[in-house]
């Protein structure tokens, strides 16, 4: 491992209605040691209470990916989109030349929990666009977001992919970061290899490694795996 980010060392923003943990520097949280990895700029782990959310705000030249873990997001944007994104679905918004949007907890009975990731695009000034989908798990590693939209994945303006990793108790996998940069963000459960144990919210970055073996604990393991351009 070239980069280890324990969950309890992440930055935090708490406004009462929002409890957000920042893997990398974001907003008022700044740490020069945690500015992102490769083209992955943001991983925010957000919890939003009932009836609350983010009012209309703007972005430009950023690929914004949202994966809902609990509850549902009500999304509305300046492109005319108004959708509900329930748990298990993933959303991609390319901000391009500029877009405004709002995100609120749609549920009246349960809190909202989601991950939001920002990836720097390889082309600036594109037309803003939006996609969302649900992709069923097909084996331990299932692709969610890619540069070419293969296998029903959302299409990203960058040479990068995001996979959902799900391992049953005791199941093992080898993650491949040869000639690339890999980043693993743990969602739930536990896993380990010979040198490190990880649990929910922990992150591991591989910038000079070829492969990484991982075995799930007794409670299984779920994570997102980012396949990113190599760090020069």
Q: For each of these PLM feature ranges, what is it?
A:
Residues 1-232:
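Jelly-roll (double-stranded beta-helix
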């Amino acid at each position: 491992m070239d980069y280890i980010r324990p969950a309890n060392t992440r930055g935090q923003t708490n406004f009462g209605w929002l409890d957000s943990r920042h893997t990398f520097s974001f907003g008022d949280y700044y740490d020069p040691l945690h500015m992102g990895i490769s083209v992955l700029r943001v991983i925010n782990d957000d919890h939003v209470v009932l009836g609350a959310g983010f009012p209309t705000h703007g972005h430009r030249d950023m690929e914004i990916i949202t994966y809902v873990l609990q509850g549902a997001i009500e999304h509305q944007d300046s492109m005319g989109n108004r959708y509900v994104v329930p748990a298990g679905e993933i959303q991609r918004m390319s901000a391009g030349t500029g877009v405004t949007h709002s995100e609120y907890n749609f549920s009246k009975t349960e809190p909202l929990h989601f991950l939001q990731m920002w990836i720097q695009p390889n082309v600036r000034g594109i037309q803003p666009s939006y996609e969302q989908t649900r992709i069923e798990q097909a084996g331990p590693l299932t692709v969610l977001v890619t540069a070419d939209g293969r296998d029903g994945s959302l299409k990203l303006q960058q040479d990068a992919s995001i996979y959902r990793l799900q391992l049953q108790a005791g199941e093992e996998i080898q993650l491949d970061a040869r000639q690339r940069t890999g980043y693993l963000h743990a969602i739930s459960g536990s896993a380990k290899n010979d040198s490190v144990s990880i649990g929910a919210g922990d992150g591991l970055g591989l910038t000079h490694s070829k492969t990484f073996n991982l075995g799930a604990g007794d409670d299984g393991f779920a994570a997102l795996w980012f396949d990113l351009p190599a760090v020069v």
